[in-house]
Amino acid sequence: MRLHELHPAPGSRPRATRVGRGIGSGLGKTSGRGHKGQKARSGGGVRRGFEGGQMPLTRRLPKRGFTNIFARKLVPINVGELERFEPETVVTPELLHDAGLVKQARDGVKILGDGELTKKLTVKVQAASRKAIEKIEAAGGKVEVM
């Protein structure tokens, strides 16, 4: 079997309906577009969200909030993912990147508390949740927030 020999099973793909090919086809004359009107014309139809001239919903609702340009973009990592490291390891953002847990460090790494940790690790990161710190310290490790 070669790629050029592959074909769909007979009857699995319906034939393309050709419109505008005479009244016997069932889709002749107006080609399923009805009579006249904006939607019957070529390029016709209204844009997404258009409500016939009524003020659209997206413009009726108020704007809210803003984007804080100073927000730190921290990459979240769960405690359970640190289980792959050997005991007594010093876990840093660079080590997490080398291990493939973090693709791009951005403004740093934040350790979150999901999962279990049994190994004693020293974790040096930009931020950690209270639950994550408790789990790391319960396993005998320590957290240093840089």
From Swiss-Prot:
<keyword id="KW-0699">rRNA-binding</keyword>
<dbReference type="GO" id="GO:0022625">
    <property type="term" value="C:cytosolic large ribosomal subunit"/>
</dbReference>
<feature type="region of interest" description="Disordered">
    <location>
        <begin position="1"/>
        <end position="58"/>
    </location>
</feature>
<keyword id="KW-0694">RNA-binding</keyword>
<dbReference type="Pfam" id="PF00828">
    <property type="entry name" value="Ribosomal_L27A"/>
</dbReference>
<protein>
    <recommendedName>
        <fullName>Large ribosomal subunit protein uL15</fullName>
    </recommendedName>
</protein>
<dbReference type="InterPro" id="IPR005749">
    <property type="entry name" value="Ribosomal_uL15_bac-type"/>
</dbReference>
<dbReference type="InterPro" id="IPR001196">
    <property type="entry name" value="Ribosomal_uL15_CS"/>
</dbReference>
<dbReference type="GO" id="GO:0006412">
    <property type="term" value="P:translation"/>
</dbReference>
<comment type="similarity">
    <text>Belongs to the universal ribosomal protein uL15 family.</text>
</comment>
<dbReference type="GO" id="GO:0019843">
    <property type="term" value="F:rRNA binding"/>
</dbReference>
<dbReference type="GO" id="GO:0003735">
    <property type="term" value="F:structural constituent of ribosome"/>
</dbReference>
<dbReference type="InterPro" id="IPR030878">
    <property type="entry name" value="Ribosomal_uL15"/>
</dbReference>
<dbReference type="InterPro" id="IPR036227">
    <property type="entry name" value="Ribosomal_uL15/eL18_sf"/>
</dbReference>
<keyword id="KW-0687">Ribonucleoprotein</keyword>
<dbReference type="InterPro" id="IPR021131">
    <property type="entry name" value="Ribosomal_uL15/eL18"/>
</dbReference>
<keyword id="KW-0689">Ribosomal protein</keyword>
<comment type="function">
    <text>Binds to the 23S rRNA.</text>
</comment>
<feature type="compositionally biased region" description="Gly residues">
    <location>
        <begin position="21"/>
        <end position="31"/>
    </location>
</feature>
<comment type="subunit">
    <text>Part of the 50S ribosomal subunit.</text>
</comment>
